[in-house]
Amino acid sequence: MNVHEFQAKSLFAQFGVPVPRGKEITSPEAATAWANELDTPVFVVKAQIHAGGRGKAGGVKITKDKAACAGLAKELIGKTLVTHQTGPKGRKVHRLLVEEGANIAKELYLSILVDRDTGWPTFIASTEGGMEIEEVADKTPEKIIKEAIDPAVGFQGHNGRNVAFALGLQQIEPAVINPFVQMLGNLYRLFMEKNAALVEINPLIITKEKTLVALDGKVSFDDNGLFKHEDVQKMRDLNEEEPLEIEATANNLNYVKLDGNIGCMVNGAGLAMATMDVIKLAGSEPANFLDVGGGATKETVAAGFRILLKDPNVKGIFINIFGGIVRCERIAHGVIEAAKEVKITVPLVVRLQGTNAPEGRKLLADSGLKLEVADDLWEAAQKIVKLTGKAA
């Protein structure tokens, strides 16, 4: 789960990480009132959407005139921002962050996440703050600093000093070394206590006053840990999430909307990804990732059908199920009952493999439903691509 920048900064402040004074704003009138209260030489008005690249898309405005904040708020609220992370449809702006500006002397990059190679929380740092870290890693990997933290021991002062000296803070500004080490400890606490998946500050600035400030922030949470954090759950902004993904979550389905025209319903994440790959190889594009889990019961399949059919781009549905512990004839019964209940209006191809697959395929073939049955993955992909009007 992602949160907005203003929410991330609120968490930073709770854990002792310095941030600019700022406030969430949802109207021009509120912008005026807050600007008068803030009374700073420079005001920064930032669109709040769950995507990066806001500055390049015109979503970040800077002014020295507090009277201009209302006009900037009016300009941004309701605007659709298109960035490299939103896709062509963009994201509509519903709220802003209005905060004080800062005197920037140096920009750094800092984040903490779980390193997939080690399984340990790991700090990522760079002197190339304010840039896309993926671009830095690609073009100048030598500028990426990593410091892994043994979770059995926790963060230690030497971990912070390792990062500080690797960044060259002793040359850049020695006065911030101790506050920097303390900040890393606070970020580690935030990461661990809140079950975060990513905590990122980009840029972390050293000001001309020789202080550290988190100028921009991002926090993502592990969905599996949300049940432990009611305060984090309250930060969820459903306006920023795909409605079909929200519905899928409510039905305990793993769904990600894509831009293709073939709806996929699969049991197991690995098989789901393989299914999307083979659809592309057959000459079409998947409309989604949908993992119905191990059961593939009538209820889960029916919920999956409803979600897929609500996507106007879906011109056909490909069900690809492997029967392991759950036998294929039981899965077939679930598919048949769900299809009758939902009333499928697009071509449907079902591929069954695994325990009692022949029996399951026979049930489907004898069901009287308008569907195609296959036992081979490539054959099934070619069938659904052909039925949706695209040549393989």
Where are these regions (language model features)?
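ATP-dependent carboxylate/acyl-activation modules
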Residues: 1-201, 205-319, 329-331, 340, ...
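Catalytic core of bacterial c-di-GMP phosphodiesterases, primarily the EAL and HD-GYP domains
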Residues: 324
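Short amphipathic alpha-helix used as the core "switch/output" element in two-component signaling
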Residues: 336-337
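Short internal beta-strands
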Residues: 345-354
